[in-house]
Design a protein with these regions (language model features):
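Solvent-exposed soluble domains appended to multi-pass membrane proteins
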Residues: 1-130
Length: 130
């Protein structure tokens, strides 16, 4: 999932997101299931720890996608001078250097874009506090 987009033909600055399969095998899995939700790669930590019934509070950007409190599925990624945010309403991509929306589908009332900006700011705040 780093360095190239998958499946082939997917771009990292538009409405398409990488679909990265993940297989979990062994004791952490209580029963077979397929999870088809919008989620982020950072959610892996909280989800796995949740299955093991371990605390995941040290991962503030990770959510347990199998938990009952996972009610607002989202995906976010940033690279260089842009970020992309997806939720059930659609996807918004923002070019930070150009200070403009570079992709939006469907048109957004600004809420989706603001959520993406808030996540990016929170990540910067977290990094600067370390």
């Amino acid at each position: 999932d780093h360095g190239f987009c998958y499946p082939q033909g997917t771009t990292d600055r538009g409405g398409e997101f990488s679909h990265i399969p993940m297989l979990w095998l062994g004791g952490a899995i209580k029963q077979p299931l397929e999870v088809d939700k919008i989620m982020n790669h950072a959610d892996l930590a909280a989800t796995l720890l949740g299955q093991l019934e371990l605390d995941h509070s040290m991962f503030p950007f990770s959510r347990n996608v199998l938990g009952s409190d996972y009610v607002y599925p989202t995906a976010f990624y940033s690279s260089g001078n842009y970020f992309t945010f997806r939720d059930s309403t659609g996807v918004s991509a923002y070019d930070i250097r150009a200070n403009c929306v570079s992709y939006e589908e469907p048109a957004d009332n600004g809420e989706r874009l603001n959520r993406g900006k808030a996540i990016l700011q929170s990540a910067y705040d977290d990094l600067s506090a370390r």
